[in-house]
Amino acid sequence: MYAVFQSGGKQHRVAPGHTVRLEKLEVATGSTVEFDQVLLIADGEKVHVGAPLVAGGKVVAEVVSHGRGEKVTIVKFRRRKHHDKKMGHRQWFTEVKITAINA
């Protein structure tokens, strides 16, 4: 059984027991989160595709941790002008473990 749900403007394909990194959620570590923007649920031969969402579909997850991702380096450079600018960015994330998928 697997599902595709939407969180933080991105779509994630998950199954029970999977651990996923999502955009930062303002929830405490150890708490339970429910995602109701489910786009698809597949259970063996049966596939429920939403238009755009599956009615009554829900993905339940437990918050494992919060953190920051790998550093991304941004370099801006102007040729012949002796000008360059270097910046870095680390995106916040929330790591969740999928506990249940309800159709």
From Swiss-Prot:
Q: Name one GO biological process term.
A: translation
Q: Which GO terms describe its cellular component?
A: cytoplasm; ribonucleoprotein complex; ribosome
Q: Does the keyword ATP-binding apply?
A: no
Q: Keyword annotations for this protein?
A: Ribonucleoprotein, Ribosomal protein, RNA-binding, rRNA-binding
Keyword Translocase part of the UniProt annotation: no
Q: Which InterPro entries match?
A: bL21-like, bL21-like_sf, Ribosomal_bL21, Ribosomal_bL21_CS
Q: Name one GO molecular function term.
A: structural constituent of ribosome
Q: Which PROSITE patterns match?
A: RIBOSOMAL_L21
Q: Name one Pfam family in it.
A: Ribosomal_L21p
- What does the subunit section of this Swiss-Prot or TrEMBL entry state? Part of the 50S ribosomal subunit. Contacts protein L20.
The role this protein plays is: This protein binds to 23S rRNA in the presence of protein L20.
Give the family per the record: Belongs to the bacterial ribosomal protein bL21 family.
Spell out the protein name for this chain.
Large ribosomal subunit protein bL21
- Taxonomic classification: Bacteria, Pseudomonadati, Pseudomonadota, Gammaproteobacteria, Alteromonadales
Gene behind this chain? rplU
